[in-house]
């Protein structure tokens, strides 16, 4: 009060008022502050007083020829006075308005091309749908997200080379454009930007946006793909969220999504093959996603997902050092442990050998729908703080943490035997056995865990064994928090090794990933995934396997033909026949195989000639391990379209139909390719394939006319006789059988009788 009174007294004196309002500020420090350096110290004030002047802008003298002195309203646009200290003219803000309305226009053709990312963003927002705003507590966790929709996935260095080549093609400096994507983009952009008048630097900035993935570590609740991140400020606040559906998709999100689906399919398929690692690599190298080789995408794309990381590890690429268990990403934040094998007894008195982590450790656990902080000692959970979207997600996190803790009460909670197997029918390791068991039913686990009274801590509540929240009691060591746990922010990548069963280890030997961790979620890929590997034929069902198998035989017929006659065993063991076996009824596989192999052997025996179409048709059946039996078949069954369909050993069927006239094969009505038969095959002597169904009567008999060729022979009526030229230029007399006999006896007797007839 005293001070205010004093001030009032001072202000009542006219001298005080005069000093404060009239005198100039000549304090050196203040003058220095506002005049040193080029940087404007008070831009807002500067702008205000500049705009209050009549001519606040300076322009090149040429402007006087380009702009009239006065506008339509008669207002002056520029002053004849020169700008002090330069030879520029003083110009009014009205001149800018005049220029914008009446000034020269330039072609706008390049704007949508250069500012592509912005134009596309506007379109997405125009077609997007904003829903209602909900007020609720937002559990946000920081995740590394892509903030730049619509980009290619070039590394900074690759992009730099492309930009230099497109924008400054004449600059010196070595630029090596090696990758397919670099070359395609460069060509495309050079064409698009011919005669572009936009400042090169601007073009370069915009190209960078299009070529490089930019990521930020941002707090997110909800969608993490780039088309959601670009509207993050509109869709979630501290206590509210607004529903939003993007008005378009962008290729980079589609690539990420399709890559995950392809990787999961490949890992799942590799797991069940004889050599998982070799199969996985073969599939990664022969798969394309949206027309780009999967291995190229893996090298450039930073997506971290279990299956994707297994594929990267197999290719020798570095991956994140965090490990995966139960679908959660674990990152150790402090402590250390040594690992020791220990035998434990389950509640069912089954012995399990587990690798115990001895020592105190702290981890963050991050999943899709829940996150947690875990503190544990040797086989003991000390504390678990969980936050999640809903009860179910929180329960999932608790189960994973309880199993990971390796506590005795968890192992004793097992009821019944643990015998979970993976896709290849191999038993899972003990930790995954326990995990699967409790994921199926965790009632006993929660019941036996124990509960404790809790202190009232801000933002934390308890959770009971039936997964209901509670403020008084909670499962021992476990609390629910409103706050999420941030994802591990570092982008550090480490060198890893992978064994043939696709287990990925860091350099200390800790398992980071294994196929058990790959999600079973099925999705539909946004981009076309083309699996060229035969191992992936079955992904589109049995029909695809059938068609692909026959297409493969026809495409590679030249090679197969030679192998068929010279080293059949190698041919039968080809992996391309593996998928086909799943179509053949289990009980019949061995018998069919034995039958077809014997048949083929007889074809080889009879003067080394054969029937192309029949070999192609029956070849896939010979791949199974054969059973020795005298069984004869006139048709072989394959399981497609939900039932058994028959392939006739002789002749066409809906499954396998060869059109002699067009030489085209259709499998289940789908074209499987055309056969270029050997030119001499039609006119050659009889081959064993045709002798089936004919009885050899003896040496040539002139009464039955000149010797027929193979094609003419097929026109005989049942019971009719004819002379036939066989392979080595010999002629024998045959009769077409009156009934369809067993094929094998024909071939066997034919072989013997030809020898007799000739000798």
Curated annotation (Swiss-Prot):
Signal sequence interval, chain numbering: none
Keyword Cell inner membrane in annotation: no
Main location class: virion
Residues the record marks as site: Avian adaptation: 627
UniProt-listed GO biological process terms: 7-methylguanosine mRNA capping; cap snatching; DNA-templated transcription; symbiont-mediated suppression of host gene expression; symbiont-mediated suppression of host mRNA transcription via inhibition of RNA polymerase II activity; viral RNA genome replication
One Pfam family of this chain: Flu_PB2_6th
InterPro entries: Flu_PB2_2nd, Flu_PB2_6th, Flu_PB2_C, Flu_PB2_CAP-bd, Flu_PB2_middle, Flu_PB2_N, INV_PB2, PB2_helical
Gene3D superfamilies assigned: Polymerase Basic Protein 2, C-terminal domain
A single MF term (Gene Ontology): RNA-directed RNA polymerase activity
UniProt-annotated location(s): Virion; Host nucleus
Position of sequence motif Nuclear localization signal: 736-739
Superkingdom in the source lineage: Viruses
Family (UniProt): Belongs to the influenza viruses PB2 family.
Chain's role: Plays an essential role in transcription initiation and cap-stealing mechanism, in which cellular capped pre-mRNAs are used to generate primers for viral transcription. Recognizes and binds the 7-methylguanosine-containing cap of the target pre-RNA which is subsequently cleaved after 10-13 nucleotides by the viral protein PA. Plays a role in the initiation of the viral genome replication and modulates the activity of the ribonucleoprotein (RNP) complex.
Protein name: Polymerase basic protein 2
Organism: Influenza A virus (strain A/Gull/Minnesota/945/1980 H13N6)
